A protein has these predicted regions:
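Oxyanion-binding "anion nests"
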Residues: 192-207
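N-terminal Rossmann-like NAD(P) cofactor-binding subdomain of oxidoreductases
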Residues: 1-191
Length: 207
């Protein structure tokens, strides 16, 4: 069975932790390195407690260099929104390495990235070298709406009520992400202006 050698940039956050959990349990995935400048040198399980006993890897302080890149097939970018574009502008990644970005930076399919919703364009994604992972709200809404749009049965406006958890805001603290505020509470979040609306419109237009 083929093994894909994988590197992760930004592995200390919530997105990186969940990706690590999935990859460590995937039979075709082999982790080569997990980069985190804030946790460099620390065991991964110290940050992601649920991975205790799953891996002995420590967070890397720097990217591979030179021929070390030959041991990497796929690179995941799990940095915050706006950081992936900056990362690729300043770092030289060999062109034969597939890049999968989990931020919002390339979901508009800029810079050679393909929008990574398999239900929309599975074969295109298979051939792509750069893939932009869809947003959470966008994915859930597209899976419901795109089949209706493709069948041309959408005759009026679509109204969606969606609720996200605390982790959607990342690890950085703010007044509205504390448990004492979130517990048993709900609030309106970017109604009619959410950034995922552009993704959904783009996908519908592509049909």
């Amino acid at each position: 069975m083929q093994k894909f050698r994988i590197g992760i940039v930004g592995g200390a956050g919530y997105t990186g932790g969940e990706l690590l959990r999935i990859l460590l349990n995937h039979p075709q995935a082999h982790l080569q390195f997990v980069l985190s400048q804030s946790q460099a040198g620390q065991p991964i399980y110290k940050t992601h407690k649920d991975l205790l006993g799953e891996t002995d890897l420590t967070f890397a302080a720097a990217l591979p260099s030179g021929k070390e890149w030959e041991d990497v097939d796929v690179l995941f970018l799990c940095s915050g929104h706006g950081q992936s574009e900056q990362f690729l502008a300043t770092e030289t990644i060999p062109s034969d390495i597939k890049i999968i970005d989990l931020s919002t930076d390339f979901r508009n399919q800029s810079n050679g990235f393909v929008y990574g919703l398999p239900e929309l364009q599975r074969e295109t994604i298979r051939q792509a070298s750069r893939i932009a992972n869809p947003g959470c709200f966008a994915t859930s809404i597209e899976l419901a709406v795109l089949p209706l749009a493709a069948a041309k049965v959408l005759k009026s406006d679509v109204h969606v009520s969606a609720i996200t958890g605390s982790t959607g805001a990342g690890q950085a603290l703010s007044a509205s992400t504390h448990f004492s505020w979130r517990n048993n509470n709900i609030s309106i979040y970017k109604a009619f202006t959410h950034q995922h609306l552009a993704e959904i419109g783009q996908s519908i237009t592509a049909l």
